Amino acid sequence: NLVGLCLIFTGVLIWYSKDYNNKLEIQDLPSSRSIYTGIIQGLAILPGVSRSGVTISILRIFGLNPLKAAKFSFLIFIPAILGATLLQLNEASRTLEEVGGSSILLGFLASSISSFLSIKFLIRLIDKQQFHYFTPYCFLVGIFLIYEGLI
């Protein structure tokens, strides 16, 4: 099961990166490492790969401190989400006509609030050196999905 394997991969990367607590600043990160991080972000196209999980982990391995890694990870997501939005504009206009503006607005508001709270929670975990707490979740759900796929 691809999703299960990808969750386990994400868990391994998060666990492996937990002991990296370097002090490198974003401006000191070599350009090549920024490019690698952007490429690794592309792994999130695979189901079960956490985009923020893999990018934060790889940035920590590259030497960024945990909070800077998280902030950089969220910044490099902006071009990806803007690109996806541009690709979907035509479809979005049809959906807006079908669903109605108030429903879209409520969905946008709920999504914005939950995203803000999720990011705040994640930053708090990272600040407390507890990002690796996601590892058991990744392993357990990954193993469960693989097991279910074998039955």
What are these regions (language model features)?
Residues 1-151:
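Multi-pass membrane proteins that catalyze or facilitate reactions on polyprenyl-/lipid-phosphate substrates
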